């Protein structure tokens, strides 16, 4: 009687339309139920309704009121959480193929089938790439996925690398090379093979892209300054601008340096052989000659030229540092000329460090953490490595060469790829001013600092550098860590602009063309200037891709490191080891800290810090953790923690504070 009744259908539609409708994001739990988080409110999703959605789905829902509680009924999919995703293979009790998405908040198995492109026979636990083909809210069917790519077997020790590269859609292989290479540059090269160039790198480095030669400038028998010659490997001498190698390098943008090995931007026969500035081998190079006075101030204009060079000594960072620091039993230079070069470069670097400390900005010393791996990929140890004097020699030489490049390109090419940083994000300038005044001003200096740290002054390179110099002597990292959250991102631009982070009016890298595509572009522009040819402005597409690739590479490195930390600490957690750690973030849910010994990131849940969550407050302006109105922890604080749990499936470490 009521079947196909138009009045009943109309009544149902009216009832439906009268209910509140919301848009939000599904938040899964480790139970069968979930929640819908909207801009203003969070709604309960009952277990039957959760079967139609997945954590992270953006959906439309109607709100039902049952008793005194509101709950969401999912109706329409706006954007699925999963499209292309990484998964592990599993088989249900009926031996039907399924996949489990590799995501900490998604635990429901998804029915799957493999495409014809995947030839491997799949086993439980294998890693694959899948795409979601059907969704209950969109297709009126169950969740269903297709396996489109095989990554590696479950037992593959290098799964952290292969899975992470697949997640970020990066190749595990070098760029495909050519059968042979020939010199493409028509210009004559200056023969500088007689100069005693040296390279300083890690002992294992094969892709050596910079060599240095230095001599003092003298007048009437007295030293007046330094003349530094920087020779940089010249891959564009062998790579045509329209070649496939160039196109592949433009897509990759950077050599990917991963724990244990690297994936080069260029074919290995170029990066590690033909272009590498190997000891006693003549190599094509792009060379910059620059001069400074004894205070490290650049004098005159730099000279760029094409040359043939020959490194006379392959030196290693640690050996040179041990030698200069006069460590017991330290390595000694093989001859007097190399010894002289090391000492002159050392003096030059100290001069430039002092110049940058006064006229630019220096970064605070923080260690790099390196994984020492066995051949099978097991982590043997994790070393905290500080930049020693030999690293600083190379760093200062490269920085001054990159400063020269920026102004050379701006003057001659009128374009280039410039590394820029605009300091504080404009929208956070008032916050930065308020924070500085709150933490540094008092009755005596308030008027002075109001002007010194005004929004207008902080927006200028000079004012920003002055502020950084002011806070540098203050103990601890709190001020720097908090101010860092107000900064904008570094950008690649095609016009000269300041780099606030370095405190410089211009900066353009050209010293790593084997490893960075932006440096290859700048090489071509420098060569065009030398040959007095037209210079083409780098396209916005190249700048955008550089930005994307830099972000991707950092995420790849971080994701692999998180996984390796879990593997390394998994067999140690049962002993509840204690570590010193630095607070990196304060959140309502707890503290994020970094272990000083090895760099691992550990989460400390708020529930382990204080039992009553109602008495916990987080001050988002200060990035500080309060208990009963008293500030207990803030970013930059050093705390002691005990490692309590390692979750390799989610690549997370959990700890407690040791009070």
Curated annotation (Swiss-Prot):
Asked if the keyword RNA-binding belongs to this entry, the reply reads: yes
Domain RNB per the UniProt entry, residue ranges: 189-531
**Which is a Gene Ontology cellular component entry for this protein?**
cytosol
What is a GO molecular function of this protein? Answer: RNA binding
List the InterPro entries. CSD (IPR011129), NA-bd_OB-fold (IPR012340), RNase_B_OB_dom (IPR013223), RNase_II (IPR011804), RNase_II/R (IPR001900), RNase_II/R_CS (IPR022966), RNase_II/RNase_R (IPR004476), RNR_Ribonuclease (IPR050180)
Per the UniProt entry, what is one GO biological process? mRNA catabolic process
| UniProt xrefs under SUPFAM superfamilies | Nucleic acid-binding proteins
Q: What is its EC number?
A: 3.1.13.1
Instruction: Give every S1 motif domain span.
Output: 576-658
Instruction: Offer one Pfam family short name for this entry.
Output: S1
Localization per record: Cytoplasm
Query: Which reaction equations make up its catalytic activity?
Result: Exonucleolytic cleavage in the 3'- to 5'-direction to yield nucleoside 5'-phosphates
Q: What class of enzyme is it?
A: hydrolase
Keyword annotations for this protein, in alphabetical order, are: Cytoplasm, Exonuclease, Hydrolase, Nuclease, RNA-binding
Entry's transmembrane regions: none
Q: What PANTHER family would the database entry show?
A: EXORIBONUCLEASE 2, RIBONUCLEASE
State the family it belongs to.
Answer: Belongs to the RNR ribonuclease family. RNase II subfamily.
NCBIfam families for the chain: 3_prime_RNase, PRK05054.1, RNase_B
General function of this protein:
Involved in mRNA degradation. Hydrolyzes single-stranded polyribonucleotides processively in the 3' to 5' direction.
Q: What is this protein called?
A: Exoribonuclease 2
Which species does the entry assign this protein to? Actinobacillus succinogenes (strain ATCC 55618 / DSM 22257 / CCUG 43843 / 130Z)
| Gene name as annotated | rnb
